[in-house]
């Protein structure tokens, strides 16, 4: 039996204050059913970051995984772009 393809999302890290956890904001373009206008929706996901390597502002790829805690069902796959530190 094959495992189904897991969901993958791309977003920006908005919080890294927890130990081994990051909060990733993912933006989705959705068309309004009645007014046919494109709306940008933002959803936040808590993701597991084993080595605490992601920082605020980084662009990251997260993948769905087994439940790690009450709110965490995603894990960090890779950091695609580092935030610019001023």
Curated annotation (Swiss-Prot):
<comment type="similarity">
    <text>Belongs to the universal ribosomal protein uS17 family.</text>
</comment>
<comment type="function">
    <text>One of the primary rRNA binding proteins, it binds specifically to the 5'-end of 16S ribosomal RNA.</text>
</comment>
<dbReference type="GO" id="GO:0019843">
    <property type="term" value="F:rRNA binding"/>
</dbReference>
<dbReference type="InterPro" id="IPR019984">
    <property type="entry name" value="Ribosomal_uS17_bact/chlr"/>
</dbReference>
<keyword id="KW-0694">RNA-binding</keyword>
<dbReference type="GO" id="GO:0022627">
    <property type="term" value="C:cytosolic small ribosomal subunit"/>
</dbReference>
<keyword id="KW-0687">Ribonucleoprotein</keyword>
<dbReference type="GO" id="GO:0006412">
    <property type="term" value="P:translation"/>
</dbReference>
<protein>
    <recommendedName>
        <fullName>Small ribosomal subunit protein uS17</fullName>
    </recommendedName>
</protein>
<dbReference type="InterPro" id="IPR012340">
    <property type="entry name" value="NA-bd_OB-fold"/>
</dbReference>
<comment type="subunit">
    <text>Part of the 30S ribosomal subunit.</text>
</comment>
<dbReference type="InterPro" id="IPR019979">
    <property type="entry name" value="Ribosomal_uS17_CS"/>
</dbReference>
<dbReference type="InterPro" id="IPR000266">
    <property type="entry name" value="Ribosomal_uS17"/>
</dbReference>
<dbReference type="Pfam" id="PF00366">
    <property type="entry name" value="Ribosomal_S17"/>
</dbReference>
<keyword id="KW-0689">Ribosomal protein</keyword>
<dbReference type="GO" id="GO:0003735">
    <property type="term" value="F:structural constituent of ribosome"/>
</dbReference>
<keyword id="KW-0699">rRNA-binding</keyword>
């Amino acid at each position: 039996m094959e495992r189904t393809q897991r969901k993958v999302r791309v977003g920006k890290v908005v919080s890294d204050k927890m130990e081994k956890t990051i909060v990733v904001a993912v933006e989705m373009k959705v068309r309004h059913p009645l007014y046919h206008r494109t709306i940008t929706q933002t959803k936040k996901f808590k993701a597991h970051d084993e080595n605490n390597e992601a920082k605020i502002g980084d662009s990251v790829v997260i993948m769905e995984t087994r439940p790690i805690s009450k709110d965490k069902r995603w894990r960090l796959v890779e950091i695609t772009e580092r935030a610019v530190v001023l």
